[in-house]
Amino acid sequence: MPVLRHMLILLCTCMLALPMHAQENVDFKGTSCVLVRTTTEEELAFRAGERMEFILHYKWGSINADVGTAKVALDSLTFNGHEAFRCTASGRTTKLFDLFFKVREEFASWFTREGMRPLKFTRDTHEGGYEARNTYLYRWDEPEPYIAADVYTSKLGQTSMQLPLTP
């Protein structure tokens, strides 16, 4: 059910949206694949402790039903010595729709409270017979920063790689 995955990704992205005036603070010099904004926690459009729950509804032809639920949460914590946020998003089909196509999705993203620099991202996906487990750990403190990526899919198996990351 790719609609559920896309909705969860959209929800996480929306939770991380910054106020428009924060774009003035973006430094594009030396930009790499990861855009890090220089903004303070007070300027953010969200706060730790926020929770959202959704009922996922599907309408197609004669099908008009609630097919699943999604949850998004934002917490504050310390991650490897950094004051950080953890945004979690999960989704699942209802027991009735599990009979047709069972979906279980879990996403988590850790990022610094000041500057919103990514620290870690995880994904645990089960959609019908397809599975994916991904972990991306941002190694900012290395002499040549990189993302340590561990990626598993039921179709391609396990892959580990280092993706270059320029701070």
Predicted regions: what is each one?
Residues 6-17:
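Bacterial N-terminal signal peptides
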